[in-house]
């Protein structure tokens, strides 16, 4: 399966998150979408391991756009901030159960969902998944 999505991306990601049984690994430059964080918190309560790394910048930390990741951590999520340096985290991918990769231009933000033209590709090609691990 190699499928590209240009519309209704958040719901496609939510569908993939809901299918996770063991582990979700996410590297995301910007993450401000509460629905996606809620889905990750739900998976943590089902004992799915969730690892999340995001960029340590103003968008992810401010009171207007930023999310409260304390609940994620309290539910057992592994949370990491990537510092801004000469080479900063600009990835946008998620690996589900080491079997499915979701990648593309879509940050997990409200802007990506409601204001930008974005895309993702969902693939179960194991060679591609391994490249991202």
Task: Give short role names for the model-derived ranges.
Residues 28:
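Glycine-rich anion-binding loop/nest that anchors nucleotide
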Residues 1-19, 31-133:
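HKD-type phospholipase D/PLD-like phosphodiesterase module
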